[in-house]
Swiss-Prot record:
Top EC category: hydrolase
Active-site residues, record numbering mapped to chain: H551 (proton donor)
Keywords carried by this UniProt record: cAMP, Hydrolase, Metal-binding, Phosphoprotein
MF terms in GO: 3',5'-cyclic-AMP phosphodiesterase activity; 3',5'-cyclic-GMP phosphodiesterase activity; kinase binding; metal ion binding; protein kinase activator activity
Stated name of the protein: High affinity cAMP-specific and IBMX-insensitive 3',5'-cyclic phosphodiesterase 8A
BP GO terms, sorted: cAMP catabolic process; cellular response to epidermal growth factor stimulus; positive regulation of ERK1 and ERK2 cascade; signal transduction
Knocked-out gene: effects: Reduced phosphorylation of Mapk1/Erk2 and Mapk3/Erk1, both basal levels and those induced by EGF treatment.
Modified residues (Phosphoserine): S355, S382, S452
Lineage: Eukaryota, Metazoa, Chordata, Craniata, Vertebrata
Residue span, PDEase domain: 475-814
Signal peptide positions on this chain: none
Length: 823
């Protein structure tokens, strides 16, 4: 990946300056290669001064010492981001040449992220003086959103102001490391670069080196635990967690348990304390308990680590499980510690009486679990022990104890799977279809996922804006004939929503909604007038964006139609209560209200206020349902809930919220798999045993609140993405609309220099058939198979098969368009 033509890179060379202001200063900082130059003897790790070489200003590189680790710093790279090459830009450019740093200059904001990801500069200097020409803080956030920028130093050049300074918090919150008050003097810029190189850059280099240390700890077969001076667990490697039976990360931040010690162990604690409090490591054998309560014998080495102020700041415990045949004998020894610390100024002088006896070691020296009292870890166990997943893990741990090696290894793999956070989400490996993998990841993630695509340019009609020429109907008896004809067969699955869209001038929701709600007796249940319901529909539809190709009121009407169709199926009518039907129809109506035509990932990457408000979690879904209730409740003329009893309203509200949140794709596989395991499989099992006797059991099982919630979530999910199950022409039109909306998002991401969440939806490189095939394969088929098994929807499944064959046929012909070329 290369940089744009406007970016110029200086070659690595030594420059001589005879200018009076460019006085030669020779400092040991990260540079091109070791040379014979003068260095400051006062700086740590620098050699003695040497004679100047004809006044030439040179900078050399030095090895960096980090504890016992020593590594080499490559030539430092600097990226200058200025909209114009003024004196300040030139000052930094000349300073880079003077220091021998590689320098890249870019004047085009849209090329910055690409250039940075290509070169991975150590320092980025951004011009923050002219916000109208360049939004420096947004650019900085964009850079920080890249995983490669974690150790990059970003400097903002600001104006020199005479008035009182304001807080730097917004500046730092944007991701800047420090600021530089404008000063075009070359030596001022040079000195700034030297300070950065010897300070922040070197510190970041050491932090990067920590990755290798943590890798060694993570892969070590020895169990290692690190605690603070107050015995708060700061780190436990996988070997430790596996040895003690804990889940990954479960112990971090927890205080070690305070456990009563029996009399036989008192001498052991005294021996440990006598060692560690005088900066000596202790090594010996003692007993401890695993999470499941089993006692194990361990060979333990406890090492105190001296830190700031010459005091003990950490304890490192290295543990090996002893062979079960060993005798229970405790042997201890003190060894003078020679571990490297971050402060060698002095030894530990503060011998705290309670350094280990009540916390770190005491939790490991108890032989009887009944002696446990109200310690922090015991409280944690009491909270978690009732969790079903914890019970499963404990049972598997117990089964491993006396199992053969192959069985133990297989159970370990089972535990690894159970300990993942996404138990219901599929995991893809390198052999999977990259296109499908990227599509699935992009639709299910609030973070960044990369896609690939093929060539395609969509030619679709521009939808006209919402028209006000069509009068709002006073009642269902006041509907114009053309619209009445368009909604005549709305109870049928093959109902043409696009015909209604044209007839209503892009206002299908209010007309379809009034008829559907009347069919289900919504006004009677809500105890509201048809006038109130009509005003509510008008208000909701006006908050859908008609400018969106896909997420507009036509999509809402389509989802409402599908939901009503599902509610009319016999199995659903037998299962759901009246309030469930009402909740489902309202949820379908409002499920995408005020949708901006952009994905959750886009809003999170752009720092949108909704993403901030909802903590980057289910951003749009939370907004849709919250806004729907806000708009409804703040206006009496639209408040369809006004006459409801308090308890009924709260039940209805909770059900609506639950259904709208279920449309978030990050939980797709969780909802589908729960439905299969909790509804489909029990039904199949009961029906196959004794059909007559199990009929009542089946009804009772389906009527539970948990089962009804699963069914309602599945219903709105299927209604929301039912496009591939519609007649072919409808399916093609929906594919065109969603593709155009995603194309528009990709265009805007590139324009704003944001991470491109779905590169597969580039209007110049997209294969619509491939995207539809992947979507059907990974999201639609299994879900509708499960839904069909419960509801019985043969017509939908036939459409799904026909549409899949259509897209497959286009793809096999290497076509990227919506339709084959005319013959």
């Amino acid at each position: 990946m290369g940089c744009a033509p406007s970016i110029h890179t200086s070659e690595n060379r030594t420059f001589s300056h005879s200018d009076g202001e460019d006085e030669d200063v020779d400092v040991d900082v990260p540079g091109p290669a070791p040379r014979s130059i003068q260095r400051w003897s006062t700086a740590p790790g620098l050699v003695e001064p040497q004679p100047r070489d004809n006044g030439a200003s040179k900078v050399s590189v030095a090895d960096v010492q980090f504890g016992p680790m020593r590594f080499h710093q490559d030539q430092l790279q600097v990226l200058l981001v200025f909209t114009k090459e003024d004196s300040q830009c030139n000052g930094f450019h000349r300073a880079c040449e003077k220091a021998g740093f590689k320098c890249t200059v870019t004047k085009e904001v849209q090329t910055v992220l690409t250039c940075f990801q290509d070169k991975l500069h150590d320092i980025i200097i951004i011009d923050h003086r002219y916000p109208r020409q360049m939004d420096a803080e947004t650019l900085c956030r964009s850079i920080r959103s890249s995983k490669f920028s974690e150790n990059t130093v970003i400097v903002g050049v600001v104006r020199r102001v005479d008035k009182e300074e304001s807080s730097l918090m917004p500046f730092l919150a944007a991701g800047f490391t420090r600021r530089f008050i404008e000063n075009p003097n070359v030596m001022a810029c040079y000195n700034e670069l030297l300070q950065l190189a010897c300070g922040e850059v070197r510190s970041q280099l050491k932090l990067r080196a920590c990755n290798s240390v943590f890798t060694a700890l993570e892969k070590s077969q020895e169990a290692i635990e690190i605690t603070s001076e107050d015995h708060i667990i700061q780190y436990a490697n996988p070997a430790f967690e596996s040895t003690m039976g804990y889940q990954s990360g479960e112990l971090i931040g927890k205080e070690l348990a305070q456990v009563p010690i029996n009399e036989k162990k008192g001498d052991l604690l005294d021996a440990i304390n006598s060692c560690v409090t005088v900066d000596k490591e202790w090594q010996g054998v003692y007993h401890t308990q695993k999470k499941n309560g089993d006692n194990i014998q361990q060979n333990v080495k406890i090492i105190p680590v001296i830190g700031q102020g010459g005091k003990i700041r950490h304890y490192v415990s290295i543990i090996r499980v002893c062979n079960g045949n060993n005798k229970v004998e405790t042997t201890t020894e003190c060894v003078q510690t020679d571990s490297q610390t971050d402060n060698q100024a002095g030894k530990h002088k503060d011998r705290r009486k309670h350094s280990m006896d009540a916390k770190a070691v005491s939790s490991r020296t108890s032989d009887v679990s009944s002696q446990r009292r109200h310690s922090s870890l015991a409280r944690i166990h009491s909270m978690m022990i009732e969790a079903p997943i914890t019970k499963v893990i404990n049972i598997i741990n117990a089964a491993q104890e006396n199992s053969p090696v192959p069985v133990t290894e297989a159970l370990n793999r089972v535990l690894d799977i159970l300990r993942t956070t996404e138990l219901y989400s599929p995991q893809f490996n390198a052999q999977d279809d990259p296109h499908a993998t990227d599509l699935v990841g992009g639709l299910m993630s609030d973070g960044l996922r990369r896609f690939s695509g093929n060539e395609y340019i969509l030619a679709t009609k521009n939808l006209p804006p919402l028209s006000n020429n069509l009068a709002t109907p006073v009642s269902l008896h006041d509907v114009p004939p053309r619209i009445a004809l368009a909604i005549e067969n709305e109870e049928q699955w093959d109902f043409d929503i696009f015909e209604l869209e044209v007839a209503t001038q892009n206002r299908p929701l209010i007309y379809l909604g009034l008829k559907t709600f009347a069919r289900f007796g919504m006004c009677e249940f809500l105890q509201c007038s048809e006038t109130t319901l009509r005003s509510w529909f008008q208000m909701i539809e006006s908050n859908y964006h008609s400018s969106n190709p896909y997420h507009n009121s036509t999509h809402a009407a389509d989802v409402l139609h599908a939901t009503a169709y599902f509610l009319s199926r016999d199995k659903i009518k037998e299962t759901l209560d009246r309030i469930d039907e009402v909740a489902a129809l309202i949820a379908a109506t409002v499920h995408d209200v005020d949708h901006p035509g952009r994905t959750n990932s886009f809003l999170c990457n752009a720092g949108n206020q909704l993403a901030v408000l909802y903590n980057d979690t289910a951003v749009l879904e939370s907004h849709h349902v919250a806004l729907a209730f806000q708009l409804t409740l703040e206006n009496d003329q639209c408040n369809i809930f006004k006459q409801m009893e308090r308890n009924d309203y709260r039940t209805l509200r909770q059900s609506i919220i639950d259904m709208v949140l279920a449309t978030e794709m990050t939980k797709h596989f969780e909802h589908v798999n729960k439905f299969i395991n909790s509804i489909n499989k029990p039904l199949t099992a009961q029906e196959s045993e004794e059909p007559d006797r199990s009929l009542e059991d089946i009804k009772a099982m389906l009527k539970t609140p948990e089962s009804r919630a699963l069914i309602k979530r599945m219903m709105i999910k299927c209604a929301d993405v039912s496009n591939p199950c519609r007649p072919l022409e409808h399916c093609i039109e929906w594919a065109a609309r969603i593709s155009e909306e995603y194309f528009s998002q990709t265009d805007e991401e590139k324009q704003l220099d944001l991470p491109v969440v779905m590169p597969v939806f580039d209007r110049n490189t997209c294969s619509i058939p491939k995207s539809q095939i992947s979507f059907i394969d990974y999201f639609i088929t299994d879900m509708f198979d499960a839904w069909d098994a419960f509801v019985d929807l043969p017509n939908l499944m036939q459409h799904l098969d026909d549409n899949f064959r259509y897209w497959k046929g286009l793809d096999e012909k290497k076509l990227r368009s919506l339709r084959p070329p005319p013959e």
